[in-house]
Amino acid sequence: MGRLFGTDGIRGVANVDLTPTIAYDLGRAVGHLLEASGRRVVIGQDTRRSGDMLVAAVSAGLASVGADAIQLGVVTTPCLAHAAAGGEFAAGIMVSASHNPAEDNGLKVLSGGRKIDDEVEEKLERLLFQAESLPGVSNRELGRITRESAPIEAYRASLIAEAGDLLQGRRIAIDCANGSASAIAPDLLRELGATVTVLGGTPDGTNINLDSGSTQPAALAAAVVAGGLEMGMAFDGDADRLIAVDDRGSIVDGDGVMGICALARLAAGTLRNRILVTTVMSNGGLDHAISEAGGRVIRTPVGDRHVFEAMERADASLGGEQSGHVIFRDVANTGDGILTAIQLLKALRDTGATLAEGASQIRLLPQVVINSAVRHRDQWEVDPEFAVAVAEADARLGARGRILVRPSGTEPKIRIMVEGEDADEINQIARELSELARARLN
């Protein structure tokens, strides 16, 4: 059996790749890794139909080895992380496939409010592969399976305290992607004083991320313009990402959001060590804007876990990804779409700028990313024709741009990013490489 864990936990088509047996075995493995019966593990899920099945299975696995499973129901991943960071729980398990389609699902393990590191993940995977042989406990030592809501209320209270009166009187639109955000964001933002137009707020178990959310913000942009609203905020299925839309309908991605927040903090002297941490996918224009303001950018491999680890090493307070995962380490240990929206509003308030004005400070280079569906996503470097084509295209761009090719860690796709000064040239290169990838890697 190959590796189960990808860049963001275990993912696959529910009941096909990701079965109740795998979820049960993961529960047993997590319980054994805790090395103590009676430990409490908190579990959350997004709105997918398969979530109930997988939560039941992972809960049973935990209970079978003496760990208590505390189910929260439908919550955001940041809500689960907040609960897991509080010291009341030994670990957290989130049942979600984030931005993936409804037929997929996933399992993410958190400890101390953050995703587990590579070393813990490897230990967990070894235990998972031998889960059937792991000893159980006696009837008297079985764990309990219960439902609690107090951790959700504690998370809501933390957001309310962080926001203060920031949203009072604002007219905004949000897209909850028919996912976890629909359970908290509309009511919370209204409680904070905003007038809220809600898109993607009617989950039915099969429509999560369907033509909505942070990966498809076109409908949100149209709603903002049509309603004459101040801005829009798009979350993904488990609400750990934020993509913003300004009053003119222009998209402000994670690079723009990070840039606005970093520049505001640099101006105020509150960006710790004057460092912004982001990944190799982020636009080169972000580096230029931060450098001009007296800061510097540290790059990491793709994945918010890598970002957080680099933030710890550099003692940085702000980092994230172009996709909208943004980590404010002085407040939380993981990306949080709702918290990011609050921090973005703080940055705009502190600088007196609109979202469009804030985003205009960062001159992003033309960049195109194409996700090509391929069966053999890990073979791009060893396929001679494709590898040569990438090298030749990179040489063609020279110092005027860059090419990044990487397999998706969560889907059967290869991501091709081309960045440069000439939009027509980079689009042509990206199309050529994408067509070749589909021909050679399928």
Regions found by a protein language model. Give the residues of each.
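Short beta-strand-to-turn element immediately C-terminal to the catalytic PLP-Schiff-base lysine
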Residues: 108-112, 243-247, 291, 327-329, ...
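N-terminal small/polar loop signature for handling phosphorylated ligands or for N-terminal nucleophile
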Residues: 31-32, 40-104, 187-245
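Buried hydrophobic positions in well-ordered alpha/beta secondary-structure cores of metabolic enzymes
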Residues: 8, 43, 80, 93, ...
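An N-terminal, well-structured beta->alpha segment
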Residues: 1-60, 64-65, 90-91, 144-172, ...
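Phosphate-binding and adjacent anionic-ligand microenvironments
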Residues: 231, 268-442
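Proline/glycine-rich low-complexity loops and linkers
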Residues: 79, 122-156, 161, 247-322, ...
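Short glycine-rich phosphate-binding loop at a beta-alpha junction
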Residues: 38-46, 70, 171-174, 274-280, ...
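Gly/Ser/Thr-enriched, mixed-charge loops and adjacent short helices
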Residues: 13, 105-227
